[in-house]
């Protein structure tokens, strides 16, 4: 398939100036301390993406970099971002590029704002409309449930929560801000007492994720992943993941991926799905309309260039044939 993608892109005569913004390392925290864990994950995703894009003939890259961080060797022109200059630089760089690939959290509307700035450009990510929906876990769950996709319900009086409950930000990313409550009533009271928090029953099962390639209501399932999450007291912490670590469930997850893409047809390019493999079947927790940390080793797991797949879709190509992933483990700091 790698040869097919290269030949397709060469046939299309791709000559594309792409601006890549990884929010955490790219100046989004300029003027504020950069959380070490987020920085490490951002670096992993960014390096993998730039290497993949640079391998595509005809692509020229620019990337933003927080001016406080050491220069790093990447196949791209680097734009230093000083404090308070981030959004001005985004506007200028997006305007000068042909295509824009944002890597940013949904929280605080950051990914939505960046995606909306790409109007009139090739956005190598999901549309602002899809990002807006997926930013809210509550809105996403309701939307998916209405389309027959199994999701975690909102906690309410009368909703069964035999394993306890969790409280988390409605627009949070990953395990950030997620707390466990043995008493569902206490979880509900906490969520109702703080704006922006939601409560859900704790779903017992294995934490897993999917890496998808989406376009026009269709999805190619790239990899089925196992997440390594530790619960310390009432908090949850990501310790790493095994991309391709749940490939034995591909037959189960392929129709789920298709259902998600049909439910949110504006999803485009790489999309991550967090879920719980419960005894009753998979339960979707959230949709990430952006790169997730799994991307850092996705190409290694697939033996194919995932970014080339996205560019092929953007150039009018059809979705690639079915793929499979071998297990690749990545530990997080």
Where are these regions (language model features)?
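ATP-dependent carboxylate/phosphate-activation module, predominantly the ATP-grasp catalytic core
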Residues: 201-265, 270, 277, 288-314, ...
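Short catalytic helix/loop segments, enriched in acidic residues and glycine
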Residues: 33-53
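Nucleotide-activated donor-dependent transferases that construct or modify glycoconjugates
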Residues: 16-38
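Active-site nucleotide/adenylate-binding loops and adjacent lid/helix of ATP-dependent enzymes
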Residues: 128-207, 214-222, 239-258
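Conserved protein kinase catalytic/activation segment
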Residues: 281-283
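Conserved N-proximal alpha/beta basic substrate-recognition cap immediately N-terminal to
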Residues: 52-53, 60-154
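Subset of Sec-pathway N-terminal targeting signals
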Residues: 1-15
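Structural motif
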Residues: 17-19, 98-99, 224
């Amino acid at each position: 398939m790698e040869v097919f993608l290269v030949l397709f892109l060469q046939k299309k005569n791709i000559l594309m100036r792409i601006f890549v913004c990884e929010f955490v390392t790219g100046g989004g925290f300029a003027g504020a301390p950069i959380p070490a864990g987020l920085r490490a994950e951002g670096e992993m995703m960014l390096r993998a993406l730039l290497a993949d894009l640079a391998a595509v003939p005809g692509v020229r890259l620019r990337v933003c970099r927080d001016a406080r961080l050491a220069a790093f060797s990447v196949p791209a022109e680097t734009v230093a971002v000083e404090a308070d200059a981030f959004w001005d630089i985004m506007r200028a760089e997006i305007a000068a590029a042909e295509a824009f690939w944002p890597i940013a959290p949904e929280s605080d509307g950051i990914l939505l704002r960046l995606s909306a700035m790409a109007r009139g450009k090739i956005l190598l990510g999901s549309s602002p409309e899809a990002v807006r929906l997926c930013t809210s876990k509550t809105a996403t769950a309701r939307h998916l449930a209405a389309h027959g996709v199994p999701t975690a319900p909102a906690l309410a009086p009368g909703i069964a929560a035999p394993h306890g409950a969790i409280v988390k930000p409605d627009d949070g990313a990953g395990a950030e801000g997620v707390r466990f409550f043995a008493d569902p009533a206490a979880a509900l009271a906490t969520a109702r007492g703080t704006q922006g928090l939601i409560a859900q029953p704790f779903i017992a099962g294995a934490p897993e994720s999917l890496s998808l390639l989406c376009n026009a209501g269709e999805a190619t399932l790239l990899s089925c992943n196992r997440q390594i999450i530790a619960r310390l007291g009432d908090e949850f912490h990501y310790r790493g993941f095994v991309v391709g670590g749940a490939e034995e469930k591909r037959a189960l997850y392929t129709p789920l991926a298709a259902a998600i893409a049909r439910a949110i047809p504006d999803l485009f390019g790489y999309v991550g799905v967090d879920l719980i493999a419960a005894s009753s079947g998979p339960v979707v927790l959230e949709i990430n309309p952006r790169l997730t940390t799994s991307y850092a080793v996705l190409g290694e797991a697939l033996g194919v260039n995932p970014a080339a797949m996205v560019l092929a879709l953007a150039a009018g190509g059809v979705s690639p044939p079915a793929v499979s992933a071998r297990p690749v483990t990545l530990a997080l700091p």
